[in-house]
Amino acid sequence: MKTKFNVEVYITEKVDLVNPFVKNRLKYALFPKDNAVTSSIIQGWQYEPYMFDFLKKNCIETYGKDIVDVGANNGNFAVEFSHLVGDAGKVHSFEPQRIIYYQLCGNVFMNGLDNVYCYNVAIGDRDGVAFIDKPDYLSLENVNFGNVSLKGEFDYNKTDIVDMKTLDEYDFNDVVFIKIDVQGYEPNVLIGAKETIKKHRPYLFVEFEEHLLIENNSSEDLLKKQIEDLGYIVKRFQEGIPYQTESGKCLDCVCIPIEKESLNHIVP
């Protein structure tokens, strides 16, 4: 399977709210006021590089595998993951925000990626629908469109309705790792992924954000125990500690299947 096709981008009129951007031969349509992932792309550095460092330093084979990206945002990881899995692998990118999903699809298309599959779906612990914050995408203020959470009730002006599914509903092939960054909804994603995790035993890259977990009736401690109960060892990137209770920080962790711990992984 050839995973890359040729795309030429023609800009006929400047749009103030969405800018085309090319860096290192990668193409992106970006909200210039998005101050998180977008700013890293514009400045030319890789967002959360320790995920890729972990895979590289531990010589983890990704070619021909599946990568699952839950909370795909604008596709910056999807583009990078596409090159990791190569012609024989697939990247499955899930993004519940309708407008950001369109952006994700556009960036996948502009880079000519045939091995990335995009889904406008909220991943959780059940099959149904979910309500999600609808930020002001026309705002000229600095914002973080990745900092959007699922809500308990519908508000016509402030929320969108999106389908919710579990990861276990999908038929993946040889999953090497799953990235989960869903603003406090990580425990629910894991509940709906038990069979997928049991079958593939992938590495997990999980975001711990205490105040968002508390809003979802969980915590860093509870999330860590939930992952350990699945047969994983939780290690925190960068500082070498698993978690920091009531930290108020956003903590990114790598979760290693306990049966692979003897490999003495290097954690960046």
Protein language model regions, located:
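S-adenosyl-L-methionine
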Residues: M1-D114, F154-N157, I233-I241, T245-P268
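Conserved acidic-Pro-Pro-aromatic motif
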Residues: D16-L17, G89-S93, D168-P268
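Short, charged, solvent-exposed linker or helix-capping segments at domain edges/interfaces
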Residues: S40-I41, A130, L140-V148, S262-P268
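Short internal loop-to-helix segment that lines adenine-nucleotide cofactor pockets
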Residues: G44-V68, F131-K134, F145-H200, L212-N217
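Short "lid" loop at the C-terminus of a central beta-strand within the Rossmann-like core
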Residues: Q97-I100, A122-D125, E210-L212
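Core alpha/beta nucleotide-donor-binding catalytic domains of modification enzymes
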Residues: C105-Y137
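Short, hinge-like loop/turn segments at secondary-structure boundaries
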Residues: F109-N111, D133-S139, E220-K225, C253
